[in-house]
Amino acid sequence: MRHRRALLFLTGAAVFVSALTAAAITGGYRLNLTPSEPLGLWRIEQLQRPVAIGDLVFLCPPSTAVFAEARVRGYLRRGLCAGGVAPLIKTVAALPGQRVEITDHVHIDGRSVPASSVSGTDGDGKVLLPDSGGVVPPHHLFLHSSFASSYDSRYFGPVPDSGLLSLARPVFTFHP
């Protein structure tokens, strides 16, 4: 009798958690567990206008060798985007036609981007090569995060805007 009650409780709890998760996903909520942006619950909001500098966005990266290597190194989580990675949550730092220069930190159109230091190695001591910079091509975005160890366009360069999913709005987030 005791085992049956425990089994019923666990089954009920599993069904409840599964239903809650499904409701959150279909309702446009996502859980961020990466340090590039605050941890916690985020809402997906459809973009009703052209993307702008400063927008915090969800974006699926392209399925390229650079992102495949990033997945192997553990920079990207597994998810439903092409290449089996989760969407990125990043801030749009530059739009097509803007000039990006990458030295020991990032400059966009001659202005220094705050919190954009470039590291030569990751947390495991593996070499990180910065992007070469240049003019952001048409239909591409240069993404940034102020988190020092963020894997963003400093390293992978501009990404196609075709991967843009939505705006990212924090609902219940915190900095650890």
Swiss-Prot record:
GO terms for biological process: signal peptide processing. Its main location: periplasm. GO terms for molecular function: serine-type endopeptidase activity. Keywords: Conjugation, Periplasm, Plasmid, Signal. The keyword Signal applies. It is found in: Periplasm. GO terms for cellular component: periplasmic space. The keyword Magnesium does not apply. Residues 1-23 form the signal peptide. Involved in conjugal transfer of the plasmid. Belongs to the peptidase S26C family. This is Conjugal transfer protein TraF. The lineage of its organism: Bacteria, Pseudomonadati, Pseudomonadota, Alphaproteobacteria, Hyphomicrobiales. The gene is traF.
